[in-house]
A protein has these predicted regions:
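PRPP-associated nucleotide enzymes
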Residues: 1-275
């Protein structure tokens, strides 16, 4: 989905599958500059973005900010074998070539992407996490691994934090379980918010939430900045969220297409001043 100055821009296709794209004649143009928001759904939208930016460059002189809350291709932030294609690198090269005034990304999964993007501004999720803490009335924050602890540990004010350590089958990468690291006694009878950057099927959070509930937590909720719709296919949503064992999942509007019961959106609002 591509939105400019708060208005969704629709695209169609000709019978041969090529792009049909016309801007609304009553589209509002901002004298200070234009904000394009790309809510990533597929790489096909990249061509629409290219065409839109080229059209603006040809027809007017204006600043253009790109808000790309979820930065795609972060999973491919390195190559290990000769025939691996470094998709993140080439994606960032295309964005750089469009010469946006600035590119705003929200809580990117990989720091490699930040090094590859020009004129990039990283929007931290601290205010979003605080809002999720307020909504959930959480007393304690749980980080599902040390990476999340290092990433978000300074964003939780004075709340008590606990973290987990995953146990994996290193041959397959599959999570076998996890251990709650001391002070696990703080969990009993408390309201807890799990905090991390992204969820796919939610396997990590399935094990984390179960461990917290086993330790006597009174309430468990989850905050992730980015959430894929595949969360609805996993045990975490179907066994824990739908049954009420996990109270809520809080996420931003960056990626999730369908909001089902148990999911709440925490809105990230971009503006030119913060970029």
């Amino acid at each position: 989905m591509i939105v400019m100055n708060g208005r969704e821009l629709t695209q169609g296709h000709f019978p041969d599958g090529t792009l049909s794209f016309k801007l609304p004649e009553d589209l509002v143009w901002d004298e200070e500059g234009q904000i394009i928001e790309w809510k990533y759904e597929s790489d096909a939208e990249l061509f629409s973005l290219i065409c839109l930016k080229r059209w603006i460059d040809e027809h007017m002189t204006t600043k253009v900010w790109l808000v790309l809350r979820y930065l795609p291709h972060a999973r491919m932030d390195r190559t290990e074998e000769f025939f691996d294609v470094f998709t993140l690198k080439y994606f960032c090269q295309v964005i750089n070539d469009l010469n946006f005034t600035q590119v705003c990304v929200l809580d990117p999964h990989s720091n490699v992407s930040i090094a590859l993007l020009d004129r990039v501004v990283v929007a931290p999720p601290d205010n979003l996490i605080r809002e999720a803490l307020d909504r959930s009335d959480a007393e304690i924050v749980c980080f599902p691994d040390q990476g999340a602890l290092k990433r978000y540990g300074k964003m939780i004010d004075n709340r008590i934090a606990v973290y987990c350590q995953k146990r994996r089958d290193w041959a397959t990468g599959k999570i076998l379980g996890l251990d709650l690291i001391d002070p696990s006694d703080d969990v009993k009878g408390r309201r807890i918010l799990i905090v991390d950057d992204i969820s796919s099927r939610g396997g990590t959070f399935y094990y984390t939430a179960n461990k917290l509930l086993e330790a006597g937590a009174a309430q468990v909720s989850l905050y992730v900045t980015h959430c894929e719709d595949t969360i609805y296919q996993g045990e975490f949503y179907n066994d824990l969220v739908k049954t009420g064992a996990v109270k809520k999942v809080y996420t931003t509007q960056s990626l999730l297409k369908e909001v089902k019961p148990g999911i709440e959106i925490v809105i990230h609002n971009p503006n030119k001043d913060s970029q």
